[in-house]
A protein has these predicted regions:
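Active-site lining segments of carbohydrate-active enzymes
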Residues: 3-137, 141-144, 156
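Carbohydrate-active enzyme catalytic cores, enriched for enzymes
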Residues: 123-270
Length: 270
């Protein structure tokens, strides 16, 4: 009560709010997957928390008509997780449609044709690729009722910028599947190449070449990689195999699985 939603340092950066929301929801789903049960008072408070995150993200997007990067991509991914979790409403339908539309646009903008992130940093490439692959997997797993929101939303209810394109969101066949999704074939091609890029910038010692910025930022950190330094475990931030493992959850390529090894099968399964 002393620090309500929207107040304090933890709400200053929308990227942080978005990543926090996605991680809270990931943790919730992991608890549910192993049989955890939550009582009604908890769920009421939990849903209110997630709704507050969604409202904050939607009204504080880090968008710029020219200069936007991983912060805005995180905003989109976080809002997508929120919209996918919450029950359908006129508001959450617009959040879902907006997130999907912008995810497709930003993948085309922020990743080059060879799959590399434009920020010229393998570590930022990992961060942004994680946002894309987990957001993509989430959309591909949406139930029919949620998918219907992509054709039934009212774009006039979206009051933030950039604007929300009118319904419906166009749907395409998923390559190699009978499923349909809002992602065109070129989107999947670029996502697959994100993993290929990570493989190509990884040295024989299993660590990526340290080029450009590296603030160790992650979207999800499910199975961190550690090395022993002076007899103590230390996280190895230059081991990016988990990103390739996560992307391989969508493509099931033997080369990706061989590169990632057995340590990150959890990321693949998610």
């Amino acid at each position: 009560a002393a620090t309500p939603p929207g107040y304090g340092v933890n709400w200053l950066c929308t990227m942080d709010v978005a990543i926090r929301a996605a991680n809270i929801l990931m943790a919730y789903d992991l608890f549910i997957s192993v049989g955890a049960e939550f009582d009604e008072p908890f769920l009421l408070e939990f849903n209110a928390l997630i709704l507050a995150h969604g409202k904050h993200i939607a009204s504080h997007l880090e968008w710029h008509d020219i200069h936007r990067a991983n912060h805005y991509l995180a905003d989109i991914a976080g809002l997508l997780f929120v919209a996918a979790y919450l029950s359908r409403s006129a508001e959450t339908d617009t959040w879902l449609a907006f997130s999907v539309q912008q995810l497709i646009k930003e993948v085309g903008l922020q990743f080059t044709s060879d799959g590399a992130n434009f920020e010229a940093s393998p570590s930022y490439h990992r961060l942004s690729s994680e946002m894309v692959v987990y957001a993509t997997a989430l959309v591909l797993s949406l139930p029919d009722d949620k998918m219907a929101a992509l054709t039934e939303f009212d774009n006039h209810l979206w009051l933030s910028h950039p604007p929300l394109d009118p319904a419906p969101v166009e749907l395409f066949p998923v390559p190699g599947s009978a499923q349909i999704s809002p992602f065109p074939a070129r989107y999947f091609e670029r996502l697959e190449r994100m993993a290929e890029f990570t493989i190509h910038v990884t040295k024989p010692n299993g660590r990526i070449a340290q080029i450009g910025d590296n603030d160790s930022g992650r979207f999800f950190k499910l199975c961190p990689s550690f090395v022993e330094v002076d007899g103590k475990p230390q996280e190895q931030h230059l081991d990016h195999r988990s990103t390739v493992a996560a992307i391989n959850g969508l493509f099931d390529r033997s080369g990706f699985a061989e590169f990632a090894g057995p340590d990150f099968t959890f990321e693949t399964s998610i």
